[in-house]
Amino acid sequence: MFRRFATTALFTTLIMTKPVHAQGITKDHHDGARFKNPWPSFVSYGFIDAFKMLTGSDKSVMSAAKPTDMPEKVDINWNLLKEKDDCKLHATWLGHACIFLQMKGFNVLLDPVFSDRCSPVQFAGPKRYTDPPCKLEELPKIDAVIISHNHYDHLDVDTIKKLSTAHPNCKFYVPLGNKAWFNLSRPLDSEGNDRVIELDWWESANIKNDTGELKFTCTPCQHFSGRGLMDRNKTLWASWCIESVTGVAKVFFGGDTGYRTVPIKTKPELQYDVDYLDTLPHCPAFKEIGEKIGPFDLALIPIGAYSPRWFMSPIHCSPEDAVELHRDIKSKHSIGIHWGTFVLTDEPVFEPPKRLKAAMERRGLDVEDFNVLPLGGTFSISI
């Protein structure tokens, strides 16, 4: 399965062409040409490392078979999705990292991907083994779309085009450098793409309507970007914080992130050992987010696509990492995302929620404070 991830990535880089990126001043996370993860918790691996993994003695075995086990799926509660209740916060899981968030009179869609494959083409690349719980056209009015980064399983041109047509007043919030993709790919129907708001880490933008106002803050995470051969890390990746301006409710969206790097030669029995993992450098950004913006009423944290651990750990949380992130940002309740939709890596389909439950128990935490939703399921809290 890891070979599927690696070969798809290679295929993707070969067919894409013109890079898009931001020309910015030098910062800790930007050298003026490319973005970077400015922490000891990140180690960069490339195609040479992937090739070694594919051809080495411990290479992964790829199976093209569709998983036989499926995540639980429920019918969407459309009455809930269409209600206007300023005192409730609703989050509905639509598959992978996509969440339909209802908060203070706003409908916000996070990392929407409704295509059959997360790929530059629809005849090759990772194919979803669980269908979305609804059609994109069935969703209520969308006020805002938030994108975490430009990988194909988080930014899908066909989905963006459909959203643009169906919701002409919708705004798109993206990390620095990604507005250029909208100009190049032209997924929106408006000239100049003034509907796209581009932010750097720790920059914020507000959205208002007749009932209230939300603040979107682009915050750090540990990942990378790229849709083609020449554009690796030329656009920024981000987590996001969504707040009501009155401070009544706060939501964290992790998008796609790593937490620490498990060294290549780590023994298999130590790769998920909490005592050993605690000795490794971890990304300090999440504690900073917790201190500056937290605590959060709800956090949406990735828990899947983490094996083989040495290769995926810098960019993808394991469930054990996700629990530490949950604690760092001071989340009152968290939902696991980024699993149960595409087979991208080696771990069994149902392993992420099982490991998540075990990791919560190991830390002495209430397993109900960080769990997963069924596909189409909604988590609701009063705010």
Regions found by a protein language model. Name each.
Residues 109-111, 141-151, 173-175, 252-257, ...:
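Active-site neighborhood of phospho(di)ester-bond hydrolases with catalytic His/Asp-centered motifs
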Residues 2-138, 243-255, 297-298, 304:
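Metallo-beta-lactamase
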Residues 133-141, 205-212, 217, 286-292:
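Short amphipathic alpha-helix with an adjacent loop that forms part of the alpha/beta core around
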Residues 123-174, 291-300:
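Active-site metal-binding motif and surrounding structural segment of the metallo-beta-lactamase
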Residues 143-144, 149, 158-207:
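Long, hydrophobic, well-ordered secondary-structure blocks that form the structural core
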Residues 186-211, 290-292, 307-383:
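Binuclear metal-ion centers of metallo-dependent hydrolases, dominated by the metallo-beta-lactamase
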Residues 158, 225-329:
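Active-site-proximal loop/helix segments of hydrolase catalytic cores
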Residues 151-155, 179-182, 203-206, 224-226, ...:
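Active-site environment of divalent metal-dependent phosphoester hydrolases
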